[in-house]
Amino acid sequence: ASDVYKRQVMKYAEKLRKGDKVAIVSLSSGMLGEAFCSHNIEIGVKRLREYGLETSFMPNSLKGIEYLKANPKARAKDLKDAFMDDSIAGIICAIGGDDTYRLLPYLLEDEEFIDAVHKSPKLFTGFSDTTINHLMFYKLGLSTYYGPNFICDLAEISDEMLPYSKKAFESYIEGNEYREITSSEIWYQERTDFLKEAVGTERISHREEHGFELLQGKECFEGRLLGGCLESLYDILTTTRYEDEKAVCEKYGLFPDIEEWKEKILFIETCEEKPVPEQFEKEIAILKEKGVFDVVSGVLVGKPQDEAYYDEYKNILVKVVNNPDLPIVYNVNFGHATPRCTLQYGAVARVDMKRKIIKCEVM
């Protein structure tokens, strides 16, 4: 793979301002283009407008599931075009999926795209399969946000965005500080009905009983943030989901090498598939094999969606990591469970479990 995209010093995009235009891209699933998502478009655009932001749907973003599944090149083109367009200040992923790795050859062999990322860094946010896009940008030296996306957050079908997630999104807008992440006082079950008829219904919510939990290790630690969705990281390293995914990701050096993991804080969270404990154990074990737990300064683990396998996951983490000195903080509000905060790749996080806060800053 070419050295052109060897990691530079991190570049940080400017925050969004009133009047800015944001692009919506479908880099994974094409569901935003399906009729059953039309109400989401309406809700999301309205909420962005309330922030004084103009929405631009990239030309291929609404072409639907089948078309985008068959045309990774079209998905990649949207991302490139968004970077080439000076009128676009930020890029919001529509939603995750499971095959955005197919975009890598079209982007990481395109000098124009790489150049545009270096010369005009833009705010980029999303989670889940978007982990792959984040790691690509990390490799290119652009700091991005593991946080809200269009369908799940801006287009949340409750009357309002979920307050904790809303605050995370607002941190992308100039003038809003987002220095401290604390545990959300409530958590929400995943919806079973996302259709138009359910618009205006509230999610089932629960009082948070656990807060951030220190499973082991010292109470205070720090490091730059690096990580993503655990299943995405596992898929990069195996042929389990797609036969060619491991080879494609290896070709472009997508999974950070061991030097890169040194003194980082690894953040990981499980997806909506709610992996059974045996699968979770495999996913943690592969990171252990890679040596990640030997060199990072600590680990943040997201709350499992619907608190699935809550205690089993905790026990597996401690057992497989097998290093009692490594700090592991569990049940942090990021990723697939709602509500969600935002974590910035490459930002310095200072975790203080005496006060149960995570402070993040760019430096």
For the regions a protein language model found, what residue spans apply to each?
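Charged helix-capping and loop-helix junction motifs
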Residues: S38-I41, P72-A76, L108-D110, F280-I286, ...
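Conserved anion/nucleotide-ligand pocket segment
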Residues: Y145-E231
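ATP/nucleoside-binding phosphotransfer catalytic cores, i.e., glycine-rich phosphate-binding loops
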Residues: Q279, A285-K288, D294, G298-M363
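Oxyanion-binding "anion nests"
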Residues: L225-P277
